[in-house]
Amino acid sequence: MKPLTNGDLFKSPTLIKISALVFVTVAFFYLGKHWSDDGYQQLVFFSSSTSGSSIPEVSVSPNSNRVFNLSAIIPTNHTQIEIPATIRQQPPSVVADTEKVKVEANPPPPPPPSPSPPPPPGPVKSFGIVDANGVMSDDFEVGEVESDTVEDWGNQTEIVEAKSDGDSKARVRIKKFGMCPESMREYIPCLDNTDVIKKLKSTERGERFERHCPEKGKGLNCLVPPPKGYRQPIPWPKSRDEVWFSNVPHTRLVEDKGGQNWISRDKNKFKFPGGGTQFIHGADQYLDQMSKMVSDITFGKHIRVAMDVGCGVASFGAYLLSRDVMTMSVAPKDVHENQIQFALERGVPAMAAAFATRRLLYPSQAFDLIHCSRCRINWTRDDGILLLEINRMLRAGGYFAWAAQPVYKHEPALEEQWTEMLNLTISLCWKLVKKEGYVAIWQKPFNNDCYLSREAGTKPPLCDESDDPDNVWYTNLKPCISRIPEKGYGGNVPLWPARLHTPPDRLQTIKFDSYIARKELFKAESKYWNEIIGGYVRALKWKKMKLRNVLDMRAGFGGFAAALNDHKLDCWVLSVVPVSGPNTLPVIYDRGLLGVMHDWCEPFDTYPRTYDFLHASGLFSIERKRCEMSTILLEMDRILRPGGRAYIRDSIDVMDEIQEITKAMGWHTSLRDTSEGPHASYRILTCEKRLLRA
């Protein structure tokens, strides 16, 4: 073999390959070093593995302590994602070091690693304020509204221009809505219309407590202000027992009912001991008594949806929540000053409603239990027409509990009232199941057999078969007994929680065009919202949001509320069924959820600052044909708490105008893509209401 010479060595292919590999390695090492020092701020990773149900998620490089210049890599039209505060903040020292690196073209070799920092201090085991004696005290209050959520707004409405689009009517563009007068801070438009109330021909049947909405063009056109000193509400479950005085600054209820263990004032808070007029020793003891009286009253199983009439501060409903029962607490506005407002501030479901001359806005066979404790209603007046309304809303086989003086006192006048009540319930075919102490409990029949077997001419009569017991919008009370469906629909719902996802029988009675099987449509809606809420929980950290009072403004079958329940979010949802669509309220109640009928072209029957979260899916693209979108949005602003959020999921066609109006209301908004991507016809507008001050 011929030995290699020096020239042959340099011509060897092996050496050429080794040299090339070394050169490439050095080059990549230099480029990697240059990229690491000069462009590190550009590193951010967006998850591309989004499922069909989730919205875009943000994941951050493990080296998240470095500073990112997000605006340099995200296009202006990209879906905006909330970035954690730890990433948004840029300490001055870090910024200065970064700029220094950019200026130096040839940085010196890195210094040797510094010694590791000392370990972080242990977790804080106590937190408080040191008093004058040097002793730490935890007796201090936290709850002021954060400064970055407060804005000086003024009280003048700013109009920019008036324009007309062809043949359409002229539209006034509002740059900024002004603040309403302080006197309107608890304004409920349809219940505070004094001009109309003064003109009523009669008020003896409670007509003044019913809806009397402002005429078209005279509705709300300003932002309802909060009371002075308004604070972020105390979160649930602590709010069940105490709320800020400054949020509901009224003491009349304390003066009237303080001795009955309803409510008391302690410095800057109202406290709720849990008592009531007929259960001074507490609601829990009272509920235990009811369960012992009737074995079938199993809260959280047979009894899932209840109504408390003349609810006071809603302690009955508040304590039923811990037993997995949703209670709609109702009372007229201002019978005892602001009792419904107290209930809502506590985080308990409630609405202003009155038994007067019209049907309440709930469907037939809605409630498993209806409760009245000293509710100041004469059930036997006008041949029992008010108890007939209770009968309409009470589920077949459901219970009516009456705690009142005629049940247990033996004065002649009270005994006469008891006899009248007993005779009326017999004519309704109700069965007196138990009378014990000051409580009497009746049960409604499961079918019409008893009604049909009564003697001819017995009053009250059965309603005509043409009567729709679910027609409730501005419908007068009827002096007749609502029929129970012949097939038992509404009376044979499963136990909770199975009823939440079981397609109810009354699904077949809903009047709407269905191109697929209704049960499949029901299940598809539940799956749709379950996946979307799952995406919100993962990407937008919904479990960290302070959600308690939630309003779904276009509820369908109640899939949104069911999904919140499935994902264990500690909130309650009122599902609204608009009058402009099919009446799905019976289905919502058969599932064990709360709902109400409403027309969003009119104001809602609740106090200002009621809800933490408003959800509107497909609402504006439908209702804009009937009324101005600003009408709906101003009402949303009235009932949303400062710091509360609204998610508007709707067509691209309406988003520009919605954004314009929300900006004029002082809301902070962000437009996002849906899970279908940037080319879908729908968008999600996430909104946050700020605390505005004049």
UniProtKB/Swiss-Prot annotation:
Q: Which GO terms describe its molecular function?
A: methyltransferase activity
Record field: compositional bias (Pro residues): 106-123
Glycosylated residues are N69, N77, N155, N378, N423
Chief place where the protein resides: Golgi
Where is the protein localized?
Golgi apparatus membrane
What segment(s) does the record annotate as region Disordered? Answer: 83-128
One record GO biological process: methylation
Sorted alphabetically, the keyword list is:
Glycoprotein, Golgi apparatus, Membrane, Methyltransferase, Signal-anchor, Transferase, Transmembrane, Transmembrane helix
Q: Which residues lie on this side of the membrane: Cytoplasmic?
A: 1-14
Cite the ranges annotated as topological domain Lumenal.
33-694
* EC class: transferase
Membrane topology according to the record: Single-pass type II membrane protein
Q: What is its EC number?
A: 2.1.1.-
Q: Check the record and name the Pfam families matching this protein.
A: Methyltransf_29 (PF03141)
Provide a GO CC annotation, any one. Answer: endosome
**Where do the TM regions start and end?**
15-32
PANTHER family found in the cross-reference section: METHYLTRANSFERASE PMT11-RELATED, SAM-DEPENDENT METHYLTRANSFERASE
Family the UniProt entry places it in = Belongs to the methyltransferase superfamily.
Protein name from the UniProt record = Probable methyltransferase PMT11
Classification from the root reads: Eukaryota, Viridiplantae, Streptophyta, Embryophyta, Tracheophyta
